[in-house]
Curated annotation (Swiss-Prot):
Family (UniProt): Belongs to the ARF family.
InterPro entries in UniProt: ARF_dom, ARF_plant, B3_DNA-bd, DNA-bd_pseudobarrel_sf, PB1-like
Expressed in which tissues: Expressed in the whole plant.
Major location (coarse): nucleus
Domain comment, as recorded: Interactions between auxin response factors (ARFs) and Aux/IAA proteins occur through their C-terminal dimerization domains III and IV.
GO biological process: auxin-activated signaling pathway; flower development; fruit development; response to auxin
Record feature DNA-binding region, as residue ranges: 126-228
Pfam families the record matches: ARF_AD, B3
Cited function: Auxin response factors (ARFs) are transcriptional factors that bind specifically to the DNA sequence 5'-TGTCTC-3' found in the auxin-responsive promoter elements (AuxREs). Seems to act as transcriptional activator. Formation of heterodimers with Aux/IAA proteins may alter their ability to modulate early auxin response genes expression. Regulates both stamen and gynoecium maturation. Promotes jasmonic acid production. Partially redundant with ARF6. Involved in fruit initiation.
Alphabetized GO MF terms: DNA-binding transcription factor activity; transcription cis-regulatory region binding
Observed phenotype of the null mutant: Seedless (parthenocarpic) fruit.
Name by which UniProt lists this protein: Auxin response factor 8
Entry superkingdom: Eukaryota
Length: 811
């Protein structure tokens, strides 16, 4: 296919003068961006029909013929883009010439370089909605002070009154002259002479908007936006709404069948969404983002001052907008609910590329290999049978195979997206062998759990959500959210019980000190009840781990079979916690001891001492992965359904104790040394013993500090204690001072600088979107992105991996 160069730079036809791109986009809106000529785009006839319905105030009737051969989205080559403005109303619109790609062109590995010039967005401008006094014949136009100082040339305040003449050009290159004066009580900026002429010529009324722009050459431009008003009288020469719907559908269907060119007109102020978008934007949204019901998201909206604002919402459903005419369409396939009370002004349905889900996938192309948070089923691949059909993205989006969910396969050719997907999918993470072993171990462990023991029941509650997740599809995410809440509640109850029991045994400190001075054999006998209590508390987890280690041919301590089958080994509570029997958990063991010999003699924790030291800090590669069982499997951060970060095993506030000589060191937990059971049990046993044995005081100042690394291209990474701040504003100010970029981080939309952070799950998120407490608890390190870094991330994706450190130091 030969590319047309007549549209490069948005040139007009037949000598028509090219419109100013900045002014056109200012009138169109801050969220509108035309694709470049020569690029590949996706055309949605369903969205085009929506525009026709909006302009004619009439929805599509049922008797309009359907075109089964017309797919819900067409991959096209954009040959020409021309910007226009209506002579009578100054309404801006764009004319696009599209040509559908052939099946062979859709399968091309490399996308042709875009030859067009990117759309130029305005930088210095202001927009004001006119009031009744602004449109009166005897008044003037009141300009906000900050807007006048930002856009208009500076006034000479030595004059009385300060005044000057302004010359501005509109979309049709017509000059308008105004007298700019600073007067009144209180004094304000006004446009007087020439303003009433402009209002009359443009037929402006209260509610319309006026836009002033100053370009790089300090030239002024002037544009208008008419408020939406209902059409009462339609000229007879105008085509009916039904005729327009039939015409656009017939033209698109013919072009799709013959691969011929067709023309569409895009009216940005009439259309609620763009129905011609860049192919790269579509691929990123549909194939590189996975959403589910209940997920949080953000979306940009235009304000009255022609700026943008983010609104937050929740995904409430995923389905076709019109399953009869447009099955398997991505157009407005996401049902949403908005947070704020003004949600009535926003659409209840949006398209996937319009939102930014607050999930594991970043808003920019991923800089790291794609890691799946949970094991995938064999039927959830986004590329079934190695093909890249457009419908496969929607099948993946809905959490299962198309046939299982009642979705019909699409009947139009594939679009050749497979080469791009190869760069993003890590197929090594999509095997099912590990998933089957994981599910089998969970099922075996759950069958060996007694039903009458409260402590074990709490562990069952922690295991069941993850076990059930492997048997359910993504459509049951709402149930999983409820189960996660129950899991967190069970964890809090267990931690509260452990803390209470520890505090009840603090009076036994003197006895513990005497025990530490006795021979090792006597210490082992006295500590046996405590050790047995902790061992039984985690016996279920050790049993699961033993099975897993045997399958993976890794060494593990030998446990007797009776550990899991002997019904006599049960917990029994004693009468009083103050009995002084030395049993930490106040349990009596009625059966035989199941404590292996090596657990009483080996361990990685420091030896006993009488002095407190800094808080316990487990060695870890990076946060959230401290108890990884499979070093080669990055999607296994939990211990058989129990999240190590939840604080179930060891709360982060438990202190550790070091000997006064400073020779006690902690070695990493390893499965190849004495086994994970030794490390976990020794950590619990020694740390609890030291808590009861020590006589010092905890240094509380070390507990409250939360140091993170901050990186910036061209600068050395620095550490920052974010616990000193209480808001994002304070953090931005401190980062600006730290790297000598004051004022650039407070307004990212204007400066182009962005602050992003990587959380404990190694995901890149935009700083400022989450509540402050959630950010403090989940941040791993912070990255300051210059405008060049942001552009590099957007253009090169994974090729920009140098922007982020691969192994940053975590404090």
């Amino acid at each position: 296919m030969k590319l047309s160069t007549s549209g490069l730079g948005q040139q007009g036809h037949e000598g028509e003068k090219c419109l100013n791109s900045e002014l056109w986009h200012a009138c169109a809106g801050p969220l509108v961006s035309l694709p470049s000529s020569g690029s590949r785009v996706v055309y949605f006839p369903q969205g085009h029909s929506e525009q026709v319905a909006a302009t004619t105030n009439k929805e599509v009737d049922g008797h309009i013929p359907n075109y089964p051969s017309l797919p819900p989205q067409l991959i096209c080559q954009l040959h020409n883009v021309t910007m226009h403005a209506d002579v009578e109303t100054d309404e801006v619109y764009a004319q696009m010439t599209l040509q559908p790609l052939t099946p062979e062109e859709q399968k091309e590995t490399f996308v042709p370089i875009e030859l067009g010039i990117p759309s130029k967005q305005p930088s210095n401008y202001f927009c004001k909605t006119l009031t009744a006094s602004d449109t009166s014949t005897h008044g003037g136009f009141s300009v906000p002070r900050r807007a006048a100082e930002k856009v208009f040339p500076p006034l000479d305040y030595t004059l009385q009154p300060p005044a000057q003449e302004l010359i501005a050009r509109d979309l049709h290159d017509v000059e308008w002259k105004f007298r700019h004066i600073f007067r009144g009580q209180p004094k304000r900026h006004l446009l007087t002479t020439g303003w009433s002429v402009f209002v009359s010529a443009k037929r402006l009324v209260a509610g319309d908007s006026v836009i002033f722009i100053r370009n790089e050459k300090n030239q002024l431009f002037l544009g208008i936006r008419h408020a939406t008003r209902p059409q009462t009288i339609v000229p007879s020469s105008v085509l009916s709404s039904d005729s327009m719907h039939i015409g656009l559908l017939a033209a698109a269907a013919h072009a799709s069948a013959t691969n011929s060119c067709f023309t569409v007109f895009f009216h940005p102020r009439a259309s609620q969404s763009e129905f011609v978008i860049q192919l790269s934007k579509y691929i990123k949204a549909v194939f590189h983002t996975r959403i589910s019901v209940g997920m949080r998201f953000r979306m940009l909206f235009e304000t009255e001052e022609s700026s943008v604002r983010r609104y937050m919402g929740t995904i409430t459903g995923i389905s076709d907008l019109d399953s009869v005419r447009w099955p398997n369409s991505h157009w407005r396939s996401v049902k949403v609910g908005w947070d704020e009370s003004t949600a009535g002004e926003r659409q209840p349905r949006v398209s996937l590329w319009e939102i930014e889900p607050l999930t594991t996938f970043p808003m920019y192309p991923s800089l790291f290999p794609l890691r799946l948070k949970r094991p995938w089923h064999a039927g959830t691949s986004s590329l079934p049978d190695g093909r890249g059909d457009l419908g496969s993205g929607l099948t993946w989006l809905r959490g299962g195979g198309g046939e299982q969910q009642g979705l019909l396969p699409l009947n139009y050719p594939s679009v050749g997206l497979f080469p791009w997907m190869q760069q993003r999918l890590d197929l090594s993470q999509m095997g099912t062998d590990n998933n089957q072993q994981y599910q089998a171990m969970l099922a075996a462990g759950l069958q060996n759990i007694g039903g009458g023991d409260p402590l074990r029941q709490q562990f069952v509650q922690l295991q069941e959500p993850h076990h059930q997740y492997l048997q359910q599809s993504a459509s049951h995410n709402s149930d999983l959210m409820l189960q996660q809440q129950q899991q967190q509640q069970a964890s809090r109850h267990l931690m509260h019980a452990q803390t209470q029991i520890m505090s009840e045994n603090l009076p036994q400190q003197n006895m513990r000190q005497e025990v530490s001075n006795q021979p090792a054999g006597q210490q082992q006998q006295l500590q046996q009840p405590d050790q047995n209590a902790y061992l039984n508390a985690f016996k279920m987890q050790n049993g699961h781990l033993q099975q897993w280690q045997q399958q993976s041919e890794m060494p593990s301590p030998s446990f007797m079979k009776s550990d899991f089958t002997d019904s006599s080994n049960k917990f029994a509570t004693t009468a009083s916690p103050a009995s002084g029997d030395g049993n930490l958990l106040n349990f009596s063991i009625t059966g035989q001891s199941v404590l292996p010999e090596q657990l009483t003699t080996e361990g990685w924790s420091p030896k006993a001492s009488n002095t407190f030291s800094e808080p316990l800090s487990l060695p870890q590669a990076y946060p959230g992965k401290s108890l990884a069982l499979e070093p080669g499997n990055p999607q296994n951060p939990s211990l058989f359904g129990v999240d190590p970060d939840s604080g179930l095993f060891l709360p982060s506030t438990v202190p550790r104790f070091a000997s006064s000589s400073g020779d006690a060191e902690a070695s990493p937990m390893s499965l190849t040394d004495s086994g994970f059971q030794n490390s976990l049990y020794s950590c619990m046993q020694d740390t609890t013993h030291e808590l009861l044995h020590g006589a010092g005081q905890i240094n509380s100042s070390n507990q409250t500090k939360n140091f993170v690394k901050v990186y910036k291209s061209g600068s050395v990474g620095r550490s920052l204690d974010i616990s000193r701040f209480s808001s994002y504003h304070e953090l931005r100010e401190e980062l600006g001072k730290m790297f000598a970029i004051e004022g650039l981080l407070e307004d990212p939309l204007r400066s182009g600088w962005q602050l992003v952070f990587v959380d404990k799950e190694n995901d890149i998120l935009l700083l400022g979107d989450d509540p402050w407490e959630s950010f403090v608890n989940n941040v791993w390190y912070i990255k300051i992105l210059s405008p060049e870094d942001v552009h590099q991330m957007g253009d090169h994706g994974e090729g920009s991996g140098g922007l982020f450190p691969q192994n940053p130091t975590h404090l």
